[in-house]
Amino acid sequence: MAGQRRESSWKPIVDAVAAYHRHNGHGPTVKEIAYVVGRSRTAVRFQLDKLIEDGIITHTPGKIRTIRVVE
């Protein structure tokens, strides 16, 4: 059950990143992700850090619009 709860918290973020990249050719900002999923930038940043740690998404530190889902 904890895994399901965890997936329900990060799945919308992964979906938003993938959709944004597909439509725009580059990654979204944290602010844009937060707007789409209806969460604070702090909450999104926390989830992004976990997703990066788990290898689900990647980004280039210090550069904007490099967040993307690992294929």
Write out the residue ranges for each language-model feature:
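Short, cationic-aromatic polyanion-contact patches
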Residues: Q4-W10, T29, T60-E71
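Short helix-capping/hinge SLiMs at alpha-helix to coil transitions
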Residues: A19-G25
